[in-house]
């Protein structure tokens, strides 16, 4: 895994949390519509009839549990990426700021440039230096683990 992939793990986890939140919201809307339809039919329900409201409720519980796990994973990844970025602060402060704004705050490049008060060419150079420092850390970690 290269430095850019490593740093973007938190972004991907955040996107997954967002998707799961939307899916859970849709399930809540569906359960409301299913509940209102089943109340309107006016027919007696036998024991063999499927229970759509209960099925949706089970899906909601499962989706909520999946969302909880995804949030925990995203927070753990954020902390790991944050610590890795902060570890290069003493070596290159600007690179640390650029990586922090881009990969922790998930800002687009134009906002990163505004936040650190540098032009895009300077920010890009600092970003590459930061990626090189992160890559070195990842390789050192991998070497020490094996």
Put a short name on every predicted segment:
Residues 5, 15, 76, 94, ...:
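Short, well-structured alpha-helical interface segments that form or flank functional binding sites
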Residues 86-96:
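Short helix-coil-helix linker/hinge
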Residues 99:
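Long, charged/polar, surface-exposed segments that mediate recognition or autoinhibition
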Residues 102-106:
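Short helix-to-turn junction characteristic of helix-turn-helix DNA-binding domains
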Residues 111-116:
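Short alpha-helical "recognition helix" segments of helix-turn-helix
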Residues 119:
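Helix-turn-helix DNA-binding motif, specifically the short coil turn and the N-cap/start of the second
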Residues 123-137:
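DNA major-groove recognition helices of helix-turn-helix
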């Amino acid at each position: 895994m290269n430095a850019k992939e490593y740093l973007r793990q938190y972004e991907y986890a955040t996107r997954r949390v967002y998707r799961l939140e939307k899916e859970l919201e849709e399930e809540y809307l569906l359960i409301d519509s299913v509940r209102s339809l089943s109340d309107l039919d006016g027919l007696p329900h036998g024991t063999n009839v499927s229970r759509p409201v209960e099925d949706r409720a089970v899906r909601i519980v499962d989706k909520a549990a999946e969302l909880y796990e995804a949030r925990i994973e995203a927070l753990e990844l954020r902390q790991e990426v944050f610590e890795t970025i902060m570890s290069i602060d003493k070596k290159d402060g600007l690179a640390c700021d650029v990586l922090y704004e881009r990969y922790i705050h998930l800002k687009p490049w134009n906002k990163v440039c505004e936040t650190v008060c540098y032009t895009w060419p300077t920010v890009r150079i600092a970003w590459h230096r930061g990626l090189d420092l992160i890559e070195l850390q990842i390789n050192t970690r991998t070497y020490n683990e094996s």
